[in-house]
A protein has these predicted regions:
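Conserved catalytic core of the tyrosine transesterase superfamily
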Residues: 1-192
Length: 192
Protein backbone atom coordinates (compact mmCIF):
# COMPACT_ATOMS: atom_id res chain seq x y z
CA UNK A 1 0.00 0.00 0.00
CA UNK A 2 2.96 2.33 0.54
CA UNK A 3 3.78 2.03 -3.17
CA UNK A 4 0.21 3.09 -3.96
CA UNK A 5 0.72 6.21 -1.84
CA UNK A 6 4.03 6.92 -3.57
CA UNK A 7 2.37 6.60 -7.00
CA UNK A 8 -0.47 8.88 -5.90
CA UNK A 9 1.91 11.57 -4.65
CA UNK A 10 3.82 11.37 -7.95
CA UNK A 11 0.51 11.76 -9.80
CA UNK A 12 -0.37 14.84 -7.73
CA UNK A 13 3.05 16.34 -8.41
CA UNK A 14 3.24 15.63 -12.13
CA UNK A 15 -0.38 15.79 -13.28
CA UNK A 16 -2.07 18.11 -10.79
CA UNK A 17 1.04 20.22 -10.09
CA UNK A 18 0.20 20.45 -6.41
CA UNK A 19 2.38 22.33 -3.95
CA UNK A 20 5.04 20.55 -1.93
CA UNK A 21 3.09 21.33 1.27
CA UNK A 22 -0.01 19.61 -0.12
CA UNK A 23 2.00 16.56 -1.12
CA UNK A 24 3.71 16.30 2.27
CA UNK A 25 0.37 16.66 4.10
CA UNK A 26 -1.39 14.08 1.93
CA UNK A 27 1.47 11.62 2.28
CA UNK A 28 1.53 12.01 6.08
CA UNK A 29 -2.27 11.61 6.30
CA UNK A 30 -2.27 8.53 4.09
CA UNK A 31 0.61 6.84 5.91
CA UNK A 32 -1.28 7.26 9.19
CA UNK A 33 -4.33 5.74 7.52
CA UNK A 34 -2.24 2.77 6.32
CA UNK A 35 -1.03 2.19 9.90
CA UNK A 36 -4.64 2.12 11.09
CA UNK A 37 -5.73 -0.19 8.27
CA UNK A 38 -2.84 -2.59 8.88
CA UNK A 39 -3.60 -2.67 12.62
CA UNK A 40 -7.18 -3.61 11.73
CA UNK A 41 -6.23 -6.46 9.39
CA UNK A 42 -6.54 -4.60 6.09
CA UNK A 43 -3.39 -5.06 4.04
CA UNK A 44 -4.61 -4.46 0.46
CA UNK A 45 -6.19 -1.40 -1.14
CA UNK A 46 -8.99 -3.46 -2.66
CA UNK A 47 -9.89 -4.76 0.82
CA UNK A 48 -10.62 -1.29 2.24
CA UNK A 49 -14.31 -0.78 3.03
CA UNK A 50 -16.35 2.36 3.73
CA UNK A 51 -16.96 1.01 7.25
CA UNK A 52 -13.27 0.74 8.16
CA UNK A 53 -12.63 4.27 6.81
CA UNK A 54 -15.57 5.58 8.80
CA UNK A 55 -14.16 3.93 11.93
CA UNK A 56 -10.81 5.57 11.23
CA UNK A 57 -12.41 9.02 10.92
CA UNK A 58 -14.25 8.47 14.21
CA UNK A 59 -10.98 7.49 15.87
CA UNK A 60 -9.31 10.65 14.51
CA UNK A 61 -12.14 12.79 15.89
CA UNK A 62 -12.02 11.08 19.29
CA UNK A 63 -8.24 11.42 19.52
CA UNK A 64 -8.62 15.15 20.06
CA UNK A 65 -7.48 16.35 16.65
CA UNK A 66 -8.94 19.63 15.48
CA UNK A 67 -11.82 19.37 12.99
CA UNK A 68 -9.67 21.06 10.32
CA UNK A 69 -7.02 18.33 10.67
CA UNK A 70 -9.60 15.55 10.45
CA UNK A 71 -11.21 17.29 7.48
CA UNK A 72 -7.87 17.45 5.67
CA UNK A 73 -7.32 13.74 6.37
CA UNK A 74 -10.73 12.96 4.89
CA UNK A 75 -9.88 15.07 1.82
CA UNK A 76 -6.59 13.14 1.48
CA UNK A 77 -8.41 9.80 1.66
CA UNK A 78 -11.11 10.87 -0.80
CA UNK A 79 -8.53 12.06 -3.34
CA UNK A 80 -6.40 8.94 -2.87
CA UNK A 81 -9.23 6.42 -3.28
CA UNK A 82 -10.66 8.34 -6.24
CA UNK A 83 -7.23 8.03 -7.88
CA UNK A 84 -7.06 4.33 -6.98
CA UNK A 85 -10.46 3.76 -8.60
CA UNK A 86 -9.39 5.64 -11.76
CA UNK A 87 -6.25 3.51 -11.89
CA UNK A 88 -8.49 0.43 -11.48
CA UNK A 89 -6.70 -0.71 -8.32
CA UNK A 90 -10.05 -0.94 -6.57
CA UNK A 91 -13.47 -1.73 -8.01
CA UNK A 92 -15.26 0.96 -5.99
CA UNK A 93 -14.21 4.08 -4.10
CA UNK A 94 -14.61 3.24 -0.38
CA UNK A 95 -14.19 6.92 0.56
CA UNK A 96 -16.90 8.19 -1.81
CA UNK A 97 -19.49 8.84 0.91
CA UNK A 98 -17.02 9.67 3.67
CA UNK A 99 -18.06 12.84 5.50
CA UNK A 100 -15.64 15.40 6.88
CA UNK A 101 -16.45 17.22 10.12
CA UNK A 102 -17.72 20.77 9.87
CA UNK A 103 -14.93 23.31 10.20
CA UNK A 104 -15.70 26.70 11.67
CA UNK A 105 -14.33 29.48 9.54
CA UNK A 106 -12.87 32.09 11.82
CA UNK A 107 -12.55 35.64 10.61
CA UNK A 108 -8.92 36.70 10.38
CA UNK A 109 -7.58 38.95 13.09
CA UNK A 110 -7.23 42.45 11.74
CA UNK A 111 -4.42 44.70 12.89
CA UNK A 112 -5.24 48.17 14.12
CA UNK A 113 -3.76 51.16 12.30
CA UNK A 114 -1.30 51.61 15.16
CA UNK A 115 -0.22 47.94 15.03
CA UNK A 116 0.19 48.14 11.25
CA UNK A 117 2.31 51.29 11.50
CA UNK A 118 4.50 49.68 14.19
CA UNK A 119 4.95 46.57 12.04
CA UNK A 120 5.89 48.57 8.95
CA UNK A 121 8.37 50.63 11.01
CA UNK A 122 10.20 47.53 12.33
CA UNK A 123 13.00 47.19 9.76
CA UNK A 124 15.01 50.23 10.88
CA UNK A 125 18.49 49.59 9.62
CA UNK A 126 19.77 50.23 6.11
CA UNK A 127 21.49 46.87 5.80
CA UNK A 128 20.56 44.60 2.89
CA UNK A 129 18.45 42.51 5.28
CA UNK A 130 16.67 45.57 6.70
CA UNK A 131 15.91 46.93 3.22
CA UNK A 132 14.71 43.48 2.12
CA UNK A 133 12.42 43.14 5.13
CA UNK A 134 11.02 46.65 4.60
CA UNK A 135 10.31 45.91 0.91
CA UNK A 136 8.64 42.61 1.79
CA UNK A 137 6.41 44.12 4.48
CA UNK A 138 5.42 47.06 2.28
CA UNK A 139 4.55 44.74 -0.62
CA UNK A 140 2.50 42.44 1.61
CA UNK A 141 0.65 45.38 3.11
CA UNK A 142 0.11 47.32 -0.12
CA UNK A 143 -0.91 44.45 -2.38
CA UNK A 144 -2.52 41.87 -0.12
CA UNK A 145 -0.56 39.07 -1.78
CA UNK A 146 0.03 35.83 0.08
CA UNK A 147 3.41 35.10 1.66
CA UNK A 148 3.79 32.15 -0.74
CA UNK A 149 3.26 34.54 -3.67
CA UNK A 150 5.76 36.99 -2.23
CA UNK A 151 8.53 34.44 -1.83
CA UNK A 152 8.03 33.15 -5.38
CA UNK A 153 8.03 36.67 -6.86
CA UNK A 154 10.75 37.26 -9.45
CA UNK A 155 12.21 40.55 -10.58
CA UNK A 156 10.62 39.95 -14.00
CA UNK A 157 7.21 39.91 -12.26
CA UNK A 158 7.64 43.54 -11.24
CA UNK A 159 6.87 46.33 -13.71
CA UNK A 160 8.29 49.50 -12.22
CA UNK A 161 7.03 51.65 -15.11
CA UNK A 162 3.37 50.78 -14.55
CA UNK A 163 3.69 50.09 -10.82
CA UNK A 164 2.20 46.59 -11.08
CA UNK A 165 3.37 43.16 -9.97
CA UNK A 166 2.31 39.92 -11.65
CA UNK A 167 1.41 36.97 -9.45
CA UNK A 168 1.07 33.56 -11.08
CA UNK A 169 -0.70 30.95 -8.97
CA UNK A 170 -2.19 27.63 -10.13
CA UNK A 171 -2.10 28.68 -13.78
CA UNK A 172 -3.82 32.00 -13.05
CA UNK A 173 -2.16 35.35 -13.51
CA UNK A 174 -3.09 38.44 -11.51
CA UNK A 175 -1.90 41.99 -12.07
CA UNK A 176 -1.74 43.85 -8.77
CA UNK A 177 -0.94 47.55 -8.33
CA UNK A 178 1.77 48.63 -5.88
CA UNK A 179 1.55 51.73 -3.75
CA UNK A 180 4.28 54.34 -4.30
CA UNK A 181 5.67 53.53 -0.83
CA UNK A 182 5.94 49.80 -1.66
CA UNK A 183 7.50 50.60 -5.04
CA UNK A 184 10.06 52.92 -3.43
CA UNK A 185 10.96 50.31 -0.78
CA UNK A 186 11.43 47.69 -3.50
CA UNK A 187 13.56 50.02 -5.66
CA UNK A 188 15.69 50.92 -2.66
CA UNK A 189 16.27 47.23 -1.82
CA UNK A 190 17.18 46.33 -5.40
CA UNK A 191 19.65 49.22 -5.70
CA UNK A 192 21.51 48.34 -2.48
Amino acid sequence: MNQDIHNFIQYLHQEKQTSENTEVSYERDLKKMILYLTAHGVDRIDAVTPEVLNSYVIELEQSGLKPATVSRSVASMKAFFHYEELEQRTSADPAFELKAPKVEKKAPTILTTEQTNRLLAQPKDNSAKGLRDKAMLELLYATGIRVSELISLKLTDVNFDTGYITCVDSHKERMIPMTPVAKDALVRYIRE
